[in-house]
């Protein structure tokens, strides 16, 4: 459904975008009460539809049932009916509303696996996210035994990828990859993309804002057929990047589930604690001692600080695990898997865990160091309170710069972040019963 990418995507003319009314907006139009509920981020009117109403394959419905999902989220209800028809989709929706399931389910619904043919291509900007998306495909295709999915990313031997792609027996129908590795495979003529029917970019703003990644994506895009479905998703999608995304598409369905002023997280309590830099370790120890949580992720600004804080926590009898870009690739994946499997309850991380990574048990996010950008705050704290569940986010504010970032966050997302109360927080307000 898309035309070939242009050589220079920066040369575009702005076109008017029409935000598609979401189900919540329609439901909220019925009464003042509904409008007020919608303002607070509630799920007004979205449970009227079940996954069965989408007329999905029985194998998909069975897998969805095994996952315990009964009703689609807001973004799923709006997107899936169009995406399974092959419509190009540009979707921005806040963290935790199941955007990944939209393209996983719609591509599996349309997939008719042919040995040796790649039908679906999914591009994302980090290896961890690629690994996670692959797992989502495995989860929803469990009753589709003929479907093969592979993940390709840098930091691993490319020869292994080439060997998998050579044989009809091992060549996947679905490829999830980072731009650099996929571009290398295209250059090596090791991957055949002439049968691609679905072209997906997850966290598309992050991929296309980087000039290097964008060039890689353009080259990859040109290696795919003229006629195909293109879908792009992100939690944040600025007005500037939207036209760039649309250059890859033909008449896309544009879905902005929440406008930019309301990109807050339903069910997530957000607080800050003002203190000196030297007081952070003591305060963090107090929080971990006093707060109830399933799993916690602690964000720091550098790999060095991640290692140092992880070492300190372990020495203070807080068994933790550190995940950051300074680790060898296999080790990063192994630590990510270990944390996801609940072998450790505390994870110290840089922003490598700040986007798209989904670990359902996390219900506490602590910004030991605040991010430099307001948008990154959303992706970080979005690790807690996924899928509309409760969660708690606490930011340690230790400098004038931190105070400025906090102001930007509150202004950007139209949210009031209050000071953490001295008496603490009632666990029932952020722990799911």
Curated annotation (Swiss-Prot):
EC number from the UniProt entry: 3.6.4.13
Motif stretch (DEAD box): 202-205
Highest rank taxon of the organism: Eukaryota
Record's keyword annotation contains Hydrolase: yes
Main location per the UniProt record: nucleus
UniProt domain Helicase ATP-binding: residue ranges: 80-255
Pfam short name (any one): Helicase_C
GO biological process, one term: mRNA splicing, via spliceosome
Lipid metabolism is among the record's keywords: no
Keyword terms, alphabetized: ATP-binding, Helicase, Hydrolase, mRNA processing, mRNA splicing, mRNA transport, Nucleotide-binding, Nucleus, RNA-binding, Spliceosome, Transport
Annotated positions binding ATP: 93-100
Molecular function terms, GO-annotated: ATP binding; ATP hydrolysis activity; RNA binding; RNA helicase activity
UniProt catalytic activity: ATP + H2O = ADP + phosphate + H(+)
Annotated motif Q motif, positions: 49-77
Localization in the cell: Nucleus
Positions of the Helicase C-terminal domain: 267-428
GO cellular component, one term: transcription export complex
Domain notes: The Q motif is unique to and characteristic of the DEAD box family of RNA helicases and controls ATP binding and hydrolysis.
Family recorded in the similarity comment: Belongs to the DEAD box helicase family. DECD subfamily.
PANTHER family, sorted: ATP-DEPENDENT RNA HELICASE DBP3
Cited function: ATP-binding RNA helicase involved in transcription elongation and required for the export of mRNA out of the nucleus. SUB2 also plays a role in pre-mRNA splicing and spliceosome assembly. May be involved in rDNA and telomeric silencing, and maintenance of genome integrity.
UniProt protein name: ATP-dependent RNA helicase SUB2
Organism of origin: Scheffersomyces stipitis (strain ATCC 58785 / CBS 6054 / NBRC 10063 / NRRL Y-11545) (Yeast)
